[in-house]
Amino acid sequence: MATLKDIAAYANVSSSTVSRVLNNDHTLSVSEVTRERILHAAKELQYTPVKIRKGMANGKDIEAPQIGIIFAQSLEEELVDPFFSSIRHGIESECAEKEIFTVKSFRLKGMKQEELLQDLDGVIVVGRVSPETVQEVSNHLDTIVFINHKADEDLYDSVMIDFEKATKHALNHLFDLGYKRIGYIGGTEREHYINGSSIIEDQRQTVFERVMHEKGLLDSEKVYIGEYSMTEGYELMAQAIKQGNLPQAFFIASDAMAIGAMRALQQSNIKVPEDVAIVSFDDVDVAAFASTPLTTVKVYTEEMGRQAVKMLVDRLSGRSIPLKVMVPTKLIYRESCGALLKKQ
């Protein structure tokens, strides 16, 4: 029997693209030629969705589950922040491998739950959402997995990363290298609801300020906050340069912002790491190829997406106890932190 991988190979596209096209995912940007090629391949290979075992729930085979994905972020936010697009890719890849092709994607803003959620067996919610939104979704569905959102652990599954541990690891590395005057560049964290969003604390900023304060090193004037984008990273570093008395190092809360920040430094003939060291967050693909390769906290975002799918399928197969998966992070050492200079 043909699989999504077979169709992907036949049509020369990825399995996740096949899954989204076959499910009529209108959030996917793909040419009509590619879409037709995938549909033709599915027809030629006589593809039909596979079945999964319901498990101990009733012992019967059922058609592949109807799974929904709710993205708290707008499309614009996802495009400028690879953190969320990588999570999406992990979800889609795991669904493709499990032959779950009935995946529906929604944006939270303006979503009508009654119309969109009624035919679903379960849903994955990506991003921070308000308690009211959690309640509204749970009114229509029992099976919900949250990614990067701390929901009620007694009720819901969640996939998280330990921002506190990761931030402390990055800062301790800078301390070990002898840096004391450390600045921060980061974005605003938002809690989303159907008709908008509100700004809430960002754990990276909170932990940074607490650790620096405890060491008597916090300079609030060297904390720069904007939006999570390359452009904002550039603008905030330009602001820091104009302000003068640059810190010895910066902890920057995303690689995209760090790349923008390094561009601003380069234009002012300020060298990284000779003049200013940088440690950032995410380890996106381009981090290793930046003008100065970035030392950065690697977040296994794709694995977060994969784990969420596994947990959802496990729930649909009969597991009743809610679980919380904490995906680890890892500091990736490259040139921007100045470690090599310290050794010379």
Tell where the protein language model's regions lie, with residue ranges.
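N-terminal helix-turn-helix DNA-binding module of bacterial transcription factors
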Residues: 1-58
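Alpha-helical recognition/docking segments in bacterial nutrient-uptake
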Residues: 2, 59-172, 176, 241-242, ...
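Short beta-strand segments enriched in small/hydrophobic residues
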Residues: 19, 57-77, 181-194
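Structural signal for hydrophobic
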Residues: 67, 144, 182, 275-276, ...
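Periplasmic-binding protein-like
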Residues: 68, 119-126, 183-186, 223, ...
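Hinge/beta->alpha junction and helix N-cap segments in small-molecule ligand-binding domains
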Residues: 74-85, 106-111, 159-169, 185-236, ...
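Flexible loop/turn connectors
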Residues: 238-344
